[in-house]
Amino acid sequence: MDKGAPPSIFVNDGSFMERFRQLQQEKDKDKDKVVQVEDSKPVKIISNPKPAANKISIGLKPNDAQKKGGKLAFSLKQKSKLLAPPVKLGTEEDEDDEDVKHEQGFGSVKRQKLEQRDTPVKSAKVSDVAPPPPSDPTVKKVADKLASFVAKHGRPFEHITRQKNPGDTPFKFLFDENCADYKYYVFRLAEEEKLISQTKDSGVLHSGDAGSRTSTAAIPLQKPAYQQTGYQIPASALYDTPVEPGASSRSAQASITRPSDSDSFSGPRGADPLSMMEFYMKKAAQEEKMRRPRQSKDEMPPPASLQGPSETSSTDPGKRGHHMGDYIPLEELDKFLSKCNDAAAQKATKEAAEKAKIQADNVGHKLLSKMGWKEGEGIGSSRKGMADPIMAGDVKTNNLGVGASAPGEVKPEDDIYEQYKKRMMLGYKHRPNPLGNPRKAYY
């Protein structure tokens, strides 16, 4: 190496590594001096440390660790390529300034937390603002009407409307609770419920001032006509314009009693879903009105002969076979029931006997009248004979022996099972014989 050359000029004489090691040792000595000066600085002790100071000391620990780590890095001469970051020396005034800044930052954190606590209240106030109405006027009208109906009659009406109107209908916003139209509907529903609760409260206060009698008479919310008649509101009422209550009740009764031309089994074709819903609601109400009341399981149904001709099983094309009691003629059935302690049948039998009584046009009645007999007197010269005529039905025509009784003859002391058995025997006796086959009388 040429000693006359300046040290900054690189000389390619093979002593490059030795030169580089000397430079690194000089840099390490300079940095060790800087660290010793910083460690020899007097430490400031505070008698009553503030909570902010504690937090500051905790926040400064990583810097101390970095300094110690830097010191260790300087002492390791093998890692010569790792250069520590430059150390900035600060005075005690700088440390005080940092304390003030940390205290200000701690206060700003508190303010941010308070602002975060206040934001839910502000957001709740903002939620009271009405959402924008739907752009489609039909959807807006449907949402308003549906909100009023649901507020009056409960959430089940909304579920029924959702089930009855699937697909692309004006009610499609019910299937997406996050859309703007559904939020508008929920807002309108809350307004309607609030209005109804206010009217109820005002009605209760008014009735309390008027007295107990007027409170029972004055009802804040009267039931609509469709609830009194058991008729459900059709969904097409959501489209109709409000009319007078009297006219609406009359039109509802007329629509129930008088079916329209569009009432067919296929329903109105090419109509909107609301008209279809109204049609099916009206049809269900008519079927419910025409449905017969259910009979108790313990009660024995009346025979088909006592029912209407359209209700008999023989005229029903959907049923096969017959009940044995259907073949009993009405006259025979009346006689049978009159012997079963049936009050209605006994009364009917007495009325029939009065109508079938022998009148003055009878030949025997005329003959006895010529002989001086009067109605109510006995036969004979002493007027003490038989007064009542002999009934032809009591004559024995079944060739029974002496002391024998007919097994199918009903008695008042028979129970319901014995009466039913004998009634079936009577029906078998009068069973039809369309082919005219000879039959033996079993009873």
Curated annotation (Swiss-Prot):
InterPro entries reported in the protein's UniProt record: G_patch_dom, SUGP1/2, Surp, SWAP/Surp_sf
Domain (G-patch): residue spans on this chain: 360-407
Compartments it resides in: Nucleus
Keyword Nucleus: yes
SUPFAM superfamilies assigned to the protein according to its UniProt record, in alphabetical order: Surp module (SWAP domain)
Keywords: mRNA processing, mRNA splicing, Nucleus
PROSITE patterns in the record: G_PATCH, SURP
Protein's name in the database: SURP and G-patch domain-containing protein 1-like protein
